[in-house]
């Protein structure tokens, strides 16, 4: 549609009877829509196009457009300022109210605890005790992985359960010792002890573990208070799954020597593949401990299968008509499954007591846990030995990553499953404060456990307060059951560890899902697992981080920019699909009543309505699947280049965009001033023209060249198969679609300036640069600062858009009409609109809310 420039927009038809034209225009549109519907049903493709020369009711469509749209009031769009940004994004966060809200958010318990009731309390009590019965044996087992005494696992368990309930935003997560963090703690202890003489006693494993807990707590708390939880999102899910799987594989093979009774012969701190080799090599050294390891392991798996799968299937099969009995039986199986670790340990501890009591350590036939101090004997402020922090510094990053990633991944997962919001920043504060306070009880790093959290969720826990009951169970065990802990077989604890950690192994289904979703994710997962197994857990973690960051960088550096073509489409409202219903579903297979309903539904559909528009889609739509692959995409008018940037326009990718756009311009258009040098040797090396075979080679190979004379000074484009060439058009318009650009920077804007200079020099004229779909006011500000978007004498004077300036208009509605109501909105006629206004600034003729239809322009 031809429009005048913004300086020439005036009301030229003030005396026209607007109401008459509005009525005529509505009648015309209704008649046109009816003709289009008839044309589509008759298969006449020409009816898709609007016949602008046809007159209806004494006025043409173009005349109506002139009356209704050509005259719009000027709208001077201003650039965004720092004050506006402050008022919009910062000001509301610096008030006393926001400060109070921030302080309250640090203690989520304030919001929900006043509503606590008996129903919640009962559910939390059941869940807390159930998880506590699992946590006690697991915590002692995981302390064994961390090369610590069992009591340190109990210390970490009870303090984690108590403190986390005050700061948590997840009701399901259970804080305490976990397998992967215990393995990382053991690695840190081993690496630090290597730096000290063997005979020193000042720096011990418990001191190193507690110091690690302190440092992890400080960092996690700081990240949470500063609201830097978004940094956790930089590591992808497949990367986390990779090092978790590798770590689980490491733990399982590290526990097999203890399971078989020859753990003193295998160094489980080596690389996993070496542990596997040495474990298999020493199988002949198996002792009686294998009985207390293999049998409990088999029992645990059979118990889990029976109570979790087979028993429930039997209940559904034999009590199908008795749902209450079936539900009670399922509840019994559920709690029986939850208690399997505790029951197995109790049974085999009793057997161990019967064969090891009143015997010295040398005479005992199996290895047992030994003395576990009763109560909280280690409470107090710890003293950090000199030089310990510097010796631990290299181990801190990997430890913090394991601590934070595992917890955030678990909490967000259960938040999605159980429909509540988890705040990552607050969760960082929760685990940070938990570990900070844990240092006073000489605990080692604790974080969220997946298996215990899943159990807690299945117990229908209602609030985080259930952690208090869980901590109470652990505290009760510390004071009352330590004498019984003395006789727990170490092989049985290893069986419990293997059984629990095996759930961390990623299944083949998840791996296949990674492959189907994104093959690169699957590759990173597999490589991370191999690095963790054949090198170390730290290297696996660092590779996972580097891979995630590299993928982000590569996606930015190699943008998915697309050159666009146009296609005319129509949105069909209430279409009548022309297909045989029987081909989809046989009406003979439907009941008569339902069959009548289906037929009646098809018959009462309203008449289709069409909304025509021009859409810009990539030329490779067959690959991108943005459009039906059978649709033909027409190129822009000659001399017009339309390019869509697929991501943010920054210093990382601006050079690549520059090259892609300028190469396409040289391919599709010709120079504005032809090179007419007499000698071919005088042409520039980067534009030598068409290559001609020397006469000697022609005679040698009897090469027959086409005799048609061509101008060698013209750039050669894609010709037809018979060797003919054509003269390419001059470049007139470059349109950049910024609808997917979230931000720009100074380097990228400067590359646009350089592109404009190069293009103007190549075309030997001022070329129009149009921008569509800009979604940020700061992008507009950046472009305007270098004289894009508006007319100026240097790059784009008024003459280059004379006769074809384009603006989108919007309809301003009256205040007395409820446009949120569907019926009111449909029944509202054009006369209910108050006026028309420019959708974008009339002072910015090169900025558009959508890509203009350049085929209507007189360029």
Swiss-Prot record:
Disulfide bonds: none annotated. Pfam families: Sulfate_transp. The chain crosses the membrane at residues 94-114, 116-136, 148-168, 173-193, 206-226, 234-254, 292-312, 332-352, 395-415, 428-448, 468-488, 525-545. One of its GO terms (biological process) is transmembrane transport. GO terms for cellular component: plasma membrane. It is a multi-pass membrane protein. The keyword Transferase does not apply. It is found in: Membrane. CDD domains: STAS_SulP_like_sulfate_transporter. One of its GO terms (molecular function) is sulfate transmembrane transporter activity. PROSITE patterns: SLC26A (PS01130), STAS (PS50801). Glycans are attached at residues 51, 93, 358, 391, 630, 653, 718. It comes from the Eukaryota. Its main location: membrane. Keywords: Glycoprotein, Membrane, Transmembrane, Transmembrane helix, Transport. Gene3D superfamilies: STAS domain. InterPro entries: S04_transporter_CS, SLC26A/SulP_dom, SLC26A/SulP_fam, STAS_dom, STAS_dom_sf. Residues 630-808 form the STAS domain. Belongs to the SLC26A/SulP transporter (TC 2.A.53) family. High affinity uptake of sulfate into the cell. This is Sulfate permease 1.
